[in-house]
Amino acid sequence: MLSAGVDSKDLSKRGESLIRQSSNRYLTTVRIAFRAKQRRFDDFDGLLEESSVKPVQRAIVELSDEQDQPDLLPG
């Protein structure tokens, strides 16, 4: 999903897209923060592979992918 780093232009476009398509900016920001916190604890517990991508960056990419490609979600 993510390489050693994240392109800053791509990351900003994904973040802008999340905010633009959201009905509530605050809730979107909270979702990103909550997901980043989960990923940070997953990294801490060793559940995720070692990565140089920061949890907030990973959260933005994951939420953007879920928004753009809902057919990838289980269920």
Curated annotation (Swiss-Prot):
GO terms for cellular component: DNA-directed RNA polymerase complex. One of its GO terms (molecular function) is DNA binding. One of its GO terms (biological process) is DNA-templated transcription. The keyword Transcription applies. Keywords: DNA-directed RNA polymerase, Nucleotidyltransferase, Transcription, Transferase. It catalyses: RNA(n) + a ribonucleoside 5'-triphosphate = RNA(n+1) + diphosphate. The keyword Transcription applies. It is an enzyme of class 2 (transferase). Its EC number is 2.7.7.6. In cyanobacteria the RNAP catalytic core is composed of 2 alpha, 1 beta, 1 beta', 1 gamma and 1 omega subunit. When a sigma factor is associated with the core the holoenzyme is formed, which can initiate transcription. Belongs to the RNA polymerase subunit omega family. Promotes RNA polymerase assembly. Latches the N- and C-terminal regions of the beta' subunit thereby facilitating its interaction with the beta and alpha subunits. This is DNA-directed RNA polymerase subunit omega. The lineage of its organism: Bacteria, Bacillati, Cyanobacteriota, Cyanophyceae, Synechococcales.
